[in-house]
Amino acid sequence: MTLLNKSIRYYVDFDQWGINAFNSNPIETTKGFNEALIYASENNFPIVEVPKGNFIIDSVNTLNQRNPEIGGGIKIPSNMELLLDPEAVFQVNPNGYQGYSCFYIGLAENVIIRGGRIIGDRYQHDYSLIDTDRKTHEWGFGIHVHGSKNVLIENVQISDCIGDNIWIAAHGMMNYPGMVYTPSKSVTVRKCELKRGRRNNLATNGCEGLLVEDCDIEEAGGDTIGPQLGIDLEGYGENGRKYDHPYELTISDCRFRKNGRGSVTAHTSGKVSIKDNYCDNVISYGYSTDVSIKGNKIINEGGSKEYGIDSVGVSSTETGNRIQITDNNIQGFKIGMMIRGKGVSIDNNTVKNASNCAIATHMAEDVSISNNRIQDSDCIQIQVRNSSDIKVSNNKGKGTTSAYAIKVMDSNDVKFLNNTFSNLYGGLYCERSQAVRIKLNDFLLSGKGYGIYWDKDSEVFLTRNEIFEPRNVAIMGAADMYNIRISDNQIYNCKAIIAIHLIGGSEHMVRGNEIMFNRDSDQGYGIYLNGTKKVRLIRNDVQGIGARVLSHPFATFNASSTTLIHNTYDSGTPRLALDDTVIDYK
């Protein structure tokens, strides 16, 4: 070591400062560490080294009865790098207070803490003392960053705190009368191991510029309090006003395992990047804005879990979410992705082994779902519910024994374009939804469901879809409420008795459809109208394969005032109503 290196490093002498390195004398030990750090700071030592030892830390600030975590434990001053030996172990002295801080970085700047191990008192804590305002004992922290900036926490092991193992907080609150808001800024947590935080493993309520990377984050929660997350980005606002707002946050290349209620939640935050992490539980964008969830492996190989990616909606302080969900691999959840809120793009993800639904929207608006792959998921592939302005395009899925590939319920302004689904029970099922456009989709059916179905309260437009081997009606609709358009669709190897069946309503257009039957027996109705009025059938073609004979390629006898123009067929005879108009249909 050079003389220059010696001159900038201060080595803590335990005897000089009355520090006990053998698990005793917590008050004297804590006092000694604080005095040593003050001495090093006042004498301009930028680096302080702590040798190995086992230290009991008095982490409670008893002078602050309301918030004993503020100013508790070892207080690190500005402009200091604290190097802890890998075998330096700091144990919180068991106590009964609502909060504590083993290490406290308050209104400081340019602070680094590296190495060492911090252990909370979770399993020795006295939870019996109940304060009228703070009843849950959830404010005990391993490292507490409070209104500080330019902070690096690296290669530290932290476990078993009664609150969060690392808590990164603002000093004060935004938009609160009489209070000055000082967020923490530019905080990095790197290569740390965080385990068994009773509330969360890491959380922030007010940080501008947070990077958490290459950390192992495990086993948060396990008690009655929440949220029990690996990382909780937990801003707060109500009635259109922000009080806490984490901002410009990146969670990257971390490994999340066995965290009680989820891996990462961006509850009410802004400009968040969650990328390239391994998780075994849910990532949620909550109410947040400008969030990117990219390249994560979200793989559940344990028990039943609800969501791979989840959400809540739009915050009262915002007009939308603006979310990007791309390139993720999601496996083993009931629902792969649950999309809520406004302004969400879901692109190029893989969802595997979903059991209830692969991708779902609920109370969502302005959503694009595109280029996703759904594998080994015997369930609804894509569901749109209580949503509007939804586009679903270029997705691919297969393999349902009792579920439709797509379900639409109580929604409007929904477009399905160029999706491919195979080996299906049924294609698309629509209820109580309007302005549903279904175009250029492929449905290869193997079950007894409909190819495309809608109820009497739905408005649909079907264009250029291909339906293969339907065993039930290929296109079926109870069209009472709206005028329906069915054009240029192709139905191949239809094994059902009816290919297109319309019930009720008036002035529908059925144009340019190609229907190919391939039944094991005679009979078959190409287009069957029941209770409709003034429907136009134009240039549709109905064909039977082999020697089987169709009954009636066009059956309008239970309808009225149908107009048939230039329709063609190769077997059977049309069965028409007396008031139909026919123009060269063969």
Curated annotation (Swiss-Prot):
Gene responsible for this protein: yorA
Entry keyword Repeat: yes
Xref: Gene3D superfamilies: Single-stranded right-handed beta-helix, Pectin lyase-like
PbH1 repeat start and end residues: 108-147, 148-170, 184-206, 207-235, 246-268, 288-313, 320-341, 364-384, 387-410, 411-432, 435-456, 481-504, 505-531
KW Repeat (keyword) present: yes
Pfam families (alphabetical): Beta_helix
Annotated protein name in UniProt: SPbeta prophage-derived uncharacterized protein YorA
Keywords: Repeat
